[in-house]
Amino acid sequence: MADFEDRVSDEEKVRIAAKFITHAPPGEFNEVFNDVRLLLNNDNLLREGAAHAFAQYNMDQFTPVKIEGYDDQVLITEHGDLGNSRFLDPRNKISFKFDHLRKEASDPQPEDVDGGLKSWRDSCDSALRAYVKDHYSNGFCTVYAKTIDGQQTIIACIESHQFQPKNFWNGRWRSEWKFTITPPTAQVVGVLKIQVHYYEDGNVQLVSHKDVQDSVTVSNEVQTAKEFIKIIESAENEYQTAISENYQTMSDTTFKALRRQLPVTRTKIDWNKILSYKIGKEMQNA
């Protein structure tokens, strides 16, 4: 083991550690971090070398965070990344510092938001909040308004999770939706992701994603927001239904095919009569 460690550079160790961290299942960042910490056995190297992995994980997972003094949680995403560990909360028009390891927000400060898109962002945010409240028992959303390559763009992010470590499973739903404000119609692009980890008496992960494209009629802010949400609702309902149906099909066919219904002898063992079997006698004589 010592010879192997001598042959692996610190840079390679950090690269491996970072990969473990960025691929941690939802709700299990701390467990993976602690395991990697033991393997690396160098806290300074881990914190300095893998800091980018902590940030990438939180942005990829749409990690929700509560800011003291504000009611709604905001999502940590690449769209709100202002650099230097500061992120944007467009709903409350503030920026804040985020500790990617502790997952804590601090130092909220007023932040200028693109005034020309305020009414568009607010309309979409209001409609999306109502949708998330109706469809997700533990859901959060953040809506951004940006000018990208000269095009005014709305970006809507949704996150919902259930962490049940006592029952040996954790899961997260993420979806991201975009459209450009270009009358009379605009293309809507979405990506939906589901990740579930079940680890009682085994280790099974469901990782799925779907890309969606549609179009929306761009009129006034309120009406366009309503049409935008209709597209989101239809696509997400269809995706959830398809996942459920595929899972049922796998349970009925694929999973059953992985295990024999009967042993090779085509006879079930009566464990109450095990001593009458040859193997039972052999075990007795052992």
UniProtKB/Swiss-Prot annotation:
Role, per record: F-actin-capping proteins bind in a Ca(2+)-independent manner to the fast growing ends of actin filaments (barbed end) thereby blocking the exchange of subunits at these ends. Unlike other capping proteins (such as gelsolin and severin), these proteins do not sever actin filaments. May play a role in the formation of epithelial cell junctions. Forms, with CAPZB, the barbed end of the fast growing ends of actin filaments in the dynactin complex and stabilizes dynactin structure.
GO BP of this protein = actin cytoskeleton organization; barbed-end actin filament capping; cell junction assembly
PTM N6-acetyllysine: list the residues.
19, 97
**Do you know which InterPro entries this protein is assigned to?**
CapZ_alpha, CapZ_alpha/beta, CapZ_alpha/beta_2, CapZ_alpha_1, F-actin_cap_asu_CS
The UniProt keywords, alphabetically, are: Acetylation, Actin capping, Actin-binding, Cytoplasm, Cytoskeleton, Phosphoprotein
Family the entry assigns: Belongs to the F-actin-capping protein alpha subunit family.
Q: Which residues carry this modification: Phosphoserine?
A: 9
Q: State whether it acts alone or in a complex, and with which partners, per the record.
A: Component of the F-actin capping complex, composed of a heterodimer of an alpha and a beta subunit. Subunit of dynactin, a multiprotein complex part of a tripartite complex with dynein and a adapter, such as BICDL1, BICD2 or HOOK3. The dynactin complex is built around ACTR1A/ACTB filament and consists of an actin-related filament composed of a shoulder domain, a pointed end and a barbed end. Its length is defined by its flexible shoulder domain. The soulder is composed of 2 DCTN1 subunits, 4 DCTN2 and 2 DCTN3.
N-acetylalanine: residues bearing it: 2
Location within or outside the cell:
Cytoplasm, Cytoskeleton
GO cellular component entries:
brush border; cell-cell junction; cortical cytoskeleton; F-actin capping protein complex; membrane; WASH complex
| UniProt-recorded name of the protein | F-actin-capping protein subunit alpha-1
List the Gene3D superfamilies hit by this protein, alphabetically: F-actin capping protein, alpha subunit, F-actin capping protein, beta subunit
Chief localization class? Answer: cytoplasm
A GO MF term: actin filament binding
What Pfam families does the record point to? F-actin_cap_A
Gene name of this polypeptide: Capza1
